[in-house]
Each structure stands twice: as C-alpha cells, then as structure tokens.
C-alpha cells in the first residue's frame, strides 16, 4: 500500500513545467489534430493558455525547450523534424502504457490538477467519449492500481472526492490542493453555473487554438 500522495519509486518524477507541457500536447493532439505535432511557439501558447489551466503559467520558449529535451531523453516526448519547422509530440501513452481513455484523463489531471469525476467527464467531452461517470471511475481506478493516480478524499465544504495524477512532486500536489478553489464556489459566487463556465472556457480555448495556428 502507498500513502496518499506517494508515487511509484521506479517512475520518474515530473516537474511542474514538464507536466504542463505533456498535458498541453495531449490536449492539442485530441482537439486540434490538424496542427499536431506542435511547433515550439504553438506549444508555449498552449502551455500559457488562460483557460482550462490550473494554475495559469507564463513559461518562456527557453523553459519549454529545455524541458522538452529533458522529456525526450526520458521517452516522454519526441522531436519531429519538418521542412518548415520542427515540431514536438508526446509519447506519454507509450511511456506509461496507457489506453486512450487513460491518456485523456491523465492529460486533464496534468492540466488542471485535482478534479471530481463529473468534472473529468465534462472536460473530456471534446477529447474522448465516455458513456457515463462509471466509465471514468473505472479508468481512474486502473490508474490508481498502477500508482499513476491518487484519490483525494473530499475536503471540508466539498461534496465529492477528487482525483489527480501521481507523477509529480507530492509537495506540489499538496500545494495545488490547498490553493485550489472549490468549483462549486466559483459558480455560486458569480451566479453562473459550473456548466456555463466550462462552456465559455471551451469557446475561449478554441479561439486561442485558432490564434496559435495563425501565428505559426
């Protein structure tokens, strides 16, 4: 048995920048296959999106480039040489032996940290079709069994348990949990439903993707 935030001793830990890079590559592969693999510039924009990212980051090309080379050396990313520009793709599914459903859930947890089953079900809609929440739970349990994800018991004021990946620094995971605002509070404070917030975030993300393609 592992403690709440332990990861497998034989799995390499990923830092916050590497986690954001891999999450962004997984997302864009699913939502923008016509522009995937991504150029370095497009990947930086994807990493620094202000929607569908928790927390929002402000990474430089140098930081992303250095992290990509580290990820490549460990089998998590690959450089694809092109006639116009070099591009990058992830190898998370190969490195961790994940099926498509597990890859999408892992990518979402990379991008947004701890989430409820319903949040994962809603946010995965553009990337993978789960029939219901039970399918999400099934895949999460398979990840937990391999010590690639962890269940976070609901905190005071929360209605549901949350799940997150187990490939980062446990201290970082603890910090994210402590700082993360309860999504239900977001909606209650503004008078807007969580579903409406998710819809607006998806629209903004689509516009940011179009901008990234225009700037390539």
UniProtKB/Swiss-Prot annotation:
Q: Which Gene3D superfamilies match?
A: Winged helix-like DNA-binding domain superfamily/Winged helix DNA-binding domain (1.10.10.10)
A Pfam family it matches = DUF480
- Origin, by domain of life? Bacteria
Xref: InterPro entries: DUF480, WH-like_DNA-bd_sf, WH_DNA-bd_sf
**Residue ranges the record marks as coiled coil:** none
For this chain, the family text in UniProt reads:
Belongs to the UPF0502 family.
Q: Which HAMAP family match?
A: UPF0502
This chain's protein is named: UPF0502 protein Pfl01_3711
The record lists the lineage as:
Bacteria, Pseudomonadati, Pseudomonadota, Gammaproteobacteria, Pseudomonadales
């Amino acid at each position: 048995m592992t403690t709440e935030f332990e990861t497998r001793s034989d799995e390499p830990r990923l830092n916050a920048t590497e986690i954001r890079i891999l999450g962004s590559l997984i997302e864009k592969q699913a939502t923008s296959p016509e522009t995937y693999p991504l150029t370095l510039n497009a990947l930086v924009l994807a990493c620094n999106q202000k929607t569908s990212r928790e927390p929002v980051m402000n990474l430089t090309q140098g930081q992303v480039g250095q992290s990509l080379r580290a990820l490549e050396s460990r089998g998590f990313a690959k450089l694809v040489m092109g006639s116009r520009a070099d591009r990058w793709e992830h190898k998370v599914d190969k490195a961790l032996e994940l099926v498509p459903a597990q890859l999408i859930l892992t990518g979402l947890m990379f991008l947004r940290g701890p989430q409820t089953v319903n949040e994962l079900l809603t946010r995965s809609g553009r990337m993978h079709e789960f029939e219901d929440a039970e399918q999400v739970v099934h895949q999460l349990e398979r990840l937990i069994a391999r010590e690639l994800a962890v269940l976070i018991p609901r905190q005071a004021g929360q209605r549901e348990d949350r799940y997150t990946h187990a490939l980062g620094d446990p201290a970082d995971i603890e910090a994210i949990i402590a700082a993360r605002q309860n999504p239900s509070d977001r909606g209650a404070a503004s008078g807007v439903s969580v579903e409406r917030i998710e819809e607006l975030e998806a629209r903004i993300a689509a516009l940011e993707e179009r901008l990234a393609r225009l700037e390539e």
